[in-house]
Amino acid sequence: MKSTNTAADSAALAAATAVAVDKSTSGTVRSSIAQEIQFVLGGRLPFVKRIETLVLGYVCVSMFFLIRYGILECGVAPTVGAFAVMYFVLDFYSGVLHVVLDDEWNMNVPLLSQPAMEFQYHHHIPDDGCSRPFVEGMGDLNFIVGLHLALFTALFVRGGSQDFMLLTAGGWKMMLAYWGIWNHRQAHQLKSKRPRWCTYLQNNGIMLSPAAHKVHHTPPHDDEYCLLGVTTWPVTWLGRRNLGSIFWIALFLGLTALDTVCASRLLSMVFAR
C-alpha cells in the first residue's frame, strides 16, 4: 500500500534524524525517538488496510435509513431538521474523538492503539490522507461506524421498531462522518488538485479550510480538532483544561452511546405530530 510504505520510510528517516541529533549534541544516544516511530521500527504498521466493501455497505445502510425512515416516515422537514442538528452533534463528536486519538497515551490502550498511532503519524505526514484513495480513508471509520450501526439497530428493535427519528439522526451521523473525512482530505489537498467547488465552500466557511486546519498541525496541536469546524471552540477550551486521558475516553464513550439518542428525542419533540 503506497501510504504504508511512505509512512515506514518516513519513520526510519525521522528515527535516524533523532539519533543523529542526539549524537551531535551530547555524544551519546538517548531514547528520544517518538513512541509511534519506535512501534514501527519494532514491526508495527503505521497504517493498516481496511475492508473497503464495508464502506459501501455502511453508506447504503445510512442512505436507506435517511430515505426509508427519514423522508418516507418522518417527512422531509424533520429529516432536514435532523441534518442541521446532527451537523453540530457529529462535529463535536469528531473533535472529541480527535482529542482521544491525538493522545499518545492511547497508543497503549486496546482498540485505540492502532488509530491513535495513525493520528500521531498524520502529524509527521500531513498529506497521507491525500495519497490514498478516498474510499480507503473512509475505511478508517469502519469500526466506529459499525459500532454506531449496531447500537442504532439494537435500540430501534428494543423500542418496538417505531423510533424512526433515531435511525434518521443515526443515518445523518454516519453520512456526516464520511463528509468529515472528505473535509479533512480537501484541507490537505493541493489547490491545483482540489475540486473548485470545494475551494469555494472552504473560502465561504462551509468546508474546513486549509488555513484553519493548519492551525491544528502547528505544535502543540491543541486547536481546530473538529472536522466540520462549527464546534471548535468548546472542544479546544476543554482540551486545554488538562482533564486527562480517562476523562476524554469517558466523554467519547458517553457521546457514542447517547448523543444521537438525545438528539433524536429532541427532534421528536420539535417535530411531534
Report each predicted region and the residues it spans.
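Low-complexity, glycine/proline/serine-enriched flexible coil segments
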Residues: 198-202
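Flexible secondary-structure boundary motifs
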Residues: 86, 172, 178-191, 195
